[in-house]
Structure formats: structure tokens, C-alpha cells
Swiss-Prot record:
The gene is lysS. Its main location: cytoplasm. Its cofactor is Mg(2+). Homodimer. Mg(2+) 1 binds at E406, E413. NCBIfam families: lysS_bact (TIGR00499), PRK00484.1 (NF001756). InterPro entries: Aa-tRNA-synt_II (IPR004364), aa-tRNA-synth_II (IPR006195), aa-tRNA-synth_II/BPL/LPL (IPR045864), Lys-tRNA-ligase_II (IPR002313), Lys-tRNA-ligase_II_N (IPR044136), Lys-tRNA-synth_II_C (IPR018149), NA-bd_OB-fold (IPR012340), NA-bd_OB_tRNA (IPR004365). GO terms for molecular function: ATP binding; catalytic activity, acting on a protein; lysine-tRNA ligase activity; magnesium ion binding; transferase activity; tRNA binding. It comes from the Bacteria. It comes from Leuconostoc citreum (strain KM20). This is Lysine--tRNA ligase. The lineage of its organism: Bacteria, Bacillati, Bacillota, Bacilli, Lactobacillales. The keyword Ligase applies. It is found in: Cytoplasm.
Amino acid sequence: MAEEKALNDQMLARRQKLATIVDDLHLDPFGKRFERTAKAQELHDLYDNSTLETLESEQHEVVIAGRMIAKRGAGKVIFADFRDVSGKIQVYAKRDDLGENYPIIKRADLGDFLGIKGIIMKTEAGELTVLATELTHLTKALRPMPDKFHGIADVETRYRKRYLDLIANEESFKKFQLRSKIISAIRAYMDSQDFMEVETPILQTEAGGAAARPFITHHNALNIDMYMRIATELYLKRLVVGGFERVYEIGRIFRNEGMDPKHNPEFTTMETYAAYMDFTDVMDETEGIFKAAASVVSDDLKVTYQGTEIDLGSNFARKHMVDLIKEQTGIDFWQDMSVEAAQKLADDKHVKYEKYWGVGHIINAFFEEFVEDTLVQPTFVYGHPVEVSPLAKRNAEDSRFTDRFELFIMGSEYGNAFTELNDPIDQRARFEAQVAERENGNDEAENIDEDFIEALEYGMPPTGGLGIGIDRLVMLLTDSDTIRDVLLFPTMR
């Protein structure tokens, strides 16, 4: 109650100052267009190495604008810190220099936006400063800013009111700048590899391309239920059928599933498809993407995640799923075995399984139980069973497995790729097997997408496809332990 009263008192005081801006200073409290000549960081880059004497003699005039985040002094002299998108810089305001302009900064509260024209200088302590010669009021903040020393204590508030988090937490602000730069670096790499960026439907009549539970909505004009997409895969493959040999899409995906530090119902992925490539080529492509992204934050392509150094500059390891299981458990799934034999092995090792599972499902469960957490450095795990890979091409040497890989780092999956299944007959059989699983209780199994099968019947060249979780990659590169820290507006109750 006391905190609420203090907040109300501060807001009342700011409203009163708002009135004085109009009545006494005859200014628009919410400003208008303002043209600046530099941002804060540009000034630091240009003049940080200049001496006090040099700046005093050269008299460089600049015009800046930003939010006031600190203020010291209240008489004839005021020092204040202003922040813009690039960083912060100190402003030195003197009543004798500014005259009738001086009340603009004297009456300003933390959070207000001002425009400042002035001369670049350095203080005796060596801090780069703008000596104000003219002030412009741009926006009055009617609510007090979060405490700059304690920030926002309530984590929920940080996520619900991200704008406050960005104001109070410079680390968070920079993290989202890095996210943008990482995605830009990925796009630049894809451009260099002759990929074309495309956009595919978010509202779809079939929820396909992944094993996930969709969000369902209703299209009133068409009077049909539709699904928020759970993957971009099937539409991108249609484009390969149509003749676009290298395509990719970065966009939002929606899955109506649980939430935890690594999962949000709405998240960003990148999927790529390249004609005449197979999954080994896609491994090379994936390394290129990760190296391009890592270059944004690290010159040597090494990053530290939760205290562990991850080397993204070296060649990523490549290991078959069955070999990794044998290394960890001694069990050899290369040998042919019945479902009953696989179930007994699972029982012996206390691995849970569903009644409808085949041997391939159990192999995958062994991998998840005994191997995933051991994969710290970047590792391509390939050779997934057919049962858990309905869209991947069978391996030519052992048809129980597919030409598919997942990239694991720190025990988490960062990418999923395969030589795409382009045989429409086999694809239909895989979809039908998925339908059977759904009837036996797997509500994440895929439906039959007749239009996609028809597209394959027109012929899709051998193709390598890749899916990467952008949010998880940003988490890795910014050392964030929860996906909510890299989503500007995460899903909240």
C-alpha cells in the first residue's frame, strides 16, 4: 500500500510538471520531429581518444537526443546521462549558457526525452561530455522509471512489461540487439549460398511437418477449422517441386504444448531446403550457419554457455545414433530384433515405452534416456529410425534407419535435418503409419496431407532439408538459461 501511494504521489508530481511545461514554458510536452547529427556511441567512437585540450580547441558541435537516465545537481549546473539506442553519454548544462532554455533540464524527470545541441568536451576526470548550448523538450514521462540500481525485481514483470525491462536492464537491451544481428548474419550467410527467402502460410488446413499438437482456430468466411502452423516444411517442399532449388524461411511456429525454460508455444525457426543435396551436405550448411551466427558474438567462434566453453569454430562431430547408444549402454541395436526383444531391453534398463511403439521408437527412447545429456560439444547425431522420421529418406544400406541428423550441443537439440523423402508412395505409407499411431493414442502423429503427396507425384528432386530453432541458438550465443530471456514478448498466463 505504501509503495502504491508513493507511486501515485510521483505520478501526481509529474502531471503537475506536465502542466508547467505547457503553462510556463509554452512547450508541447510530447514534442515533434527532431533531427540529430549523431548517436551516443558514434561520439564515443570518434572522440574517446581525443584529449581535453584537443576537443576544447576544435569545438565540435553535435546534436543528440535520448532518454534522461541520471541527473546530478540542481542549481546553476546540472550533469545528466542520456541514453539512446546505441548507448549513453553525459550532458553538462549550465544556466549561464542556456538562459531561458535551462528550466527544460532543471524541471526534467528521469525518463524524459530531450534533444541537446552542444559542443563535445571532456571533463577533468576524462569523461566525454556534451556541453549543452540548446535544449529541446521531446517527451514527458508520466510514470517514474524503475530503480536503476535494483532494476525490476519481479521476473514476471520483466516479461509482461518488456519495455520496462529494456529501460532498466542494459544487458537485456543489448541481448535483443544481438538477437537481431544474429538473424541478420544468418540471412547474409544464406544469401551467400544462393538461397531465396520466402514466406509460407501461417494459417493452414492441415497441421503437418512435425510431431506436435497444433492450435486450432476457425475461419468464419470459409466456415472451416484451420491450424496455426507447427512447421514450414511441407509448403517449402512444394516450392522445391515448383522449381525453386534453394529456399528458406525464418518465421514463427505455434505448438499447443507445455512450457519450460526451453519451450514457448510461439517461437521462431528457420527451415532450409536445397535441391540436389543430401543430409551430409546439410551438415556442412549447418556448420556454416552456426559459425556465421557465432561470429556476431565471438571472434574465435568460442562461446561460454552456463559456465561451459562451446567451440563452434572446429568441425562438429558426426556420430550414428546406434553407435552412441552402444557406447553408453553396451546395447547393440545394429542387430535385428523383434519388438518383444526391444521391449525387454527397455524393461531391463527402466526405459518407458508405449504399447504401439516399434523397435525404432525404443531405439530413440534409449538415445534420449542415455545419450542426449552426454553431448556437450557440437555433435551431429545421424541415423534416426524410420518410425520417428516420417518425412526423411530411408538409408540405402539399412532401411530401418533414415538419412537424418540432429545437432546436439550441451545436451539440447539445435537442429534437425534429413535427406528429404521424395518418393510419394513411401510418403503415403509413412503418413498412414502415423494415422495408425494416432488411433493408438499418439495425438502428435501427423495426418495425411493429400495435397502434399500430389505435389510429390509431380516430382521433387533429391533434396536436403534443415530446421533450426532460432530462439535456442540465441540462448546459446547470449548465455541465456531460459527462452523467455530471448523472446521480446514471451507467452504469459
